[in-house]
Amino acid sequence: MAFLFLSTAAAQAADISELVEKRISADRTTLDLTGLNIGPQDAKKLAAMESLSSVITLHLQGNRIKARGIKALARSPHLVNLKHLDLWGNLLGDRGLKAIVESPYLKNLVSLKLWKNEISDDSLEFLAKSRNFANLKVLMLNDNLITPFGAAIIAESENLLQLTTLNLFRNEVGDDGAIAFSKSAHFPSLESLFLGENSITDKGAVPLIESQNFPALKTLDLGKNLLGEPTALAAFKINRKEKVRIIYR
């Protein structure tokens, strides 16, 4: 996905409050600051703005706010009504995810998009144990640093029961991670699971495809993995029933 980025100097020159007024929707429920590269300092200023209290959807893709910026936002009482938060490409790291997870205000999120943020296994335990995500339906963690260990942490979580979409594309989930998901009974509402490009072989793919633990599943994406005939056969058997779409190429 490509965004038009303003230079750092230009973004900093514009007062953040002016940017907000220009980019907030007419009904003041959606704020789109995509690609402005506002950085940690302006993220802190943003967090202090009372005008955010009506915002339900916040787009902050490509702003390099880092852990310092998201910590300020996570501590802002003005974001208590937020339901949709997109943080693609912000260099949040594990400290950033931990700040989101521990926020006393970000408890109403329905979608949380954290792709390409250098998130590793280290912070996933905080995510998995948090009671803040009772309403979360969409969780995007693609393009991060998640290994089989981290995948198992997510798979074993009992606090993500409402998820309908889980995206772990382009991590290092591997066979052990795929098997952990196949054994999980904690995703009764999951409709879409994306595990493409995760170094998964037939050993992990087949039990996941054959798992009976995803009653609502509609799409299982295993594309761009190291898959052979056993996976193709398992996918064919499921695909012909036309209830679940298995992508494996």
How would you label these PLM feature ranges?
Residues 1-7:
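Bacterial N-terminal signal peptides
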Residues 7-44, 237-249:
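The feature captures the LRR N-terminal capping module
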Residues 26, 50-53, 77-80, 104-107, ...:
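Inter-repeat linker/turn residues at the boundaries of leucine-rich repeats
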Residues 29-33, 58-60, 82-87, 109-114, ...:
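Conserved hydrophobic beta-strand positions in leucine-rich repeat
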Residues 36, 63, 90, 114-117, ...:
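Consensus "Asn ladder" position of solenoid repeat domains
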Residues 202, 206-249:
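Leucine-rich solenoid repeat scaffolds
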